[in-house]
Structures are given as C-alpha cells and as structure tokens.
Amino acid sequence: MARPRLHDAALRARLLDVASRAISQHGEGAVTVRSVAADAGTSPSAVYALYGSRDELVAAVSAEGFRRFAAHLATVDRTADPRADLAALGRAYRGFALADPHFYAVMFARGVRPGAGRPRAVEEATFLVLRDAVARLVPDPTSAADVALGLWGLVHGLVSLELAGLVPGDGAERSARYDATLAAVGPGLVRRTGT
C-alpha cells in the first residue's frame, strides 16, 4: 500500500499565495517560514517539505511573479501599429510594477531567481513578449533581441527610479514623463538597427 501524501498541491499553492500576499503587503522581510506556515494553517515542516527553505519559497514567489508578469504583458492588444504596441507594453510594464511594488521588487531582487530546475524559463517568457513585439519592426532576430533588451532596460530603469521616489511630480506628471521618455528614446533604439 502506498504511503499517503502528507502535503499536496493545494497546500503548496496556499503557501505560495500566503508568501506572495506577505511580500505584496509588507515586503520580502515579512516572509518567515513560521509566519507563512501559521497563516496557511500548517506547520513549518510542511514549508520545508514542499519548498526546502525560505529562500526557495521566495524564489517560487519570484517565479510566480514572472508568470503573472508575462500573462499581464500578453493581454496588451496587438494592433496594426507595432510602435504603438511597444508603447502600450511599456505602459503595461509600469502599471504592473506600480500596482504591486513589493512583489515586483522580489521578482528582480539580486539573488532571487526561480531556482535550479527552472533557471530562466519564467524570465524568458516575459522577455519573449517584448522581443516578439520588437520583431515586427526589426526582422533580424539578433537585432530584435538586442533592441528588446535595450527597451527592457529603459522601462525597468524608469520604473525603478519611480519606485525609489526619484521621479518628481504626482501620478499624472510621472506618467507623462514616462511616456515622453519612451517616445524620445524607444524609436532611437529601433532606428539604430537600420529600420
């Protein structure tokens, strides 16, 4: 007779949800094995059995964040205007980060990565949405990837500055600055590839 499973997929998902909410509300420092277990109605040993460590639990939150991020970017409508679509992706990127800054911070925090068994796939899904949008303007795959990386760096830098409180103005003024910067710099990155 097979041994019954002590911890199932539902508990794994519940622990991930509890840790995600703790990060969203209070930042990564709020995640402890004991507090996550208590909030999920289980024991710390269940967290260790399912995730191995606090760091692996946070890495799972990061991976989940990238999955959510890719899904969010994929909802941006594709129109007949690829430049407008890139701008819309940039605004969606910013909107995702501003809606849940703690979660966003964990996704990109130094040393927090999805884990050994899934090293880059979740980040790549996010990047591929952008690269595919750029490829409509830049047919060469290598150039499209380079431009996409440049655009990602641009929007990530702008969002990081805004989240750090370094972009002056109220919400509307910051949005206008963001859009103006994308409009000024984005086309230059695309033009440098010869299109």
Specify the residue positions occupied by each region the protein language model found:
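Helix-turn-helix
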Residues: 14, 18, 22-56, 60
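Amphipathic C-terminal alpha-helical segment
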Residues: 153-170, 185-194
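Alpha-helical DNA-contacting segments of helix-turn-helix folds
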Residues: 23, 58-65, 107, 115, ...
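N-terminal intrinsically disordered/low-complexity leader segments
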Residues: 1-10, 21, 193-195
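Short hydrophobic clusters on alpha-helical segments that form packing/core surfaces
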Residues: 15-23, 65, 69, 93
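Hydrophobic alpha-helical connector segments
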Residues: 60, 74-103, 123-127, 144, ...
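Amphipathic alpha-helical packing segments from all-alpha helical-bundle domains
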Residues: 114-139, 145-150, 172-187
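Amphipathic alpha-helical segments used for helix-helix packing
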Residues: 98-115, 160-168
